[in-house]
């Protein structure tokens, strides 16, 4: 997503990823007489080597090494955008939801899960109601790391816990949405934000299949404006510059989009 605009603007990029045939590396050549670094984007040594070559270090996805990015920034090796604090927040979906909730951003009902026991899950299900979605706090992406719980039977609870593995979890109340909506928001270092028009995202098997623009919401006038306003407000509370994808559910009344 960075390489095409960078090529059009004549901005040289160094891309850190494992292998020489990753999509970004195939799309944009490294600056003259150099090559893209080869290695995992969670590796401290590779990140530090990349930082020495760059004026600004940014990320395409949040599943990176935030600790190293903080060190790179504090040591002055290069500028890091968005702020490592923002990346760390986005990495933990529960902390992200709590952060937005505390700042008045509408989110789905949620509860943290401490001990992953049958009794603990039952209490949370009683509070949020069934069905309830059990979610991994970290390394979750595009439906991965989610397990819907339809009942509080021992077998169903254990099946969900086994599926989600050893990662920390939280629970989210069920949202009977009618559309999934996304807004791209641009934020600069001074905190100014601008957004693009909202789009509808259609998923199948937890994978985005179709993205429709402009957003079509028959009988729900003003949804685009409300979605953009909500997305800009959410991103306005973050730190650092970047382009952020804000996903939300559109509820049946058309009046209450909530951040995912």
Show which residues each predicted segment covers.
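A conserved helix-loop-beta module that forms one wall/lid of the active-site cleft
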Residues: 75-78, 82-150
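A short beta-strand motif that forms the metal-chelation/ATP-contact edge
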Residues: 255-260
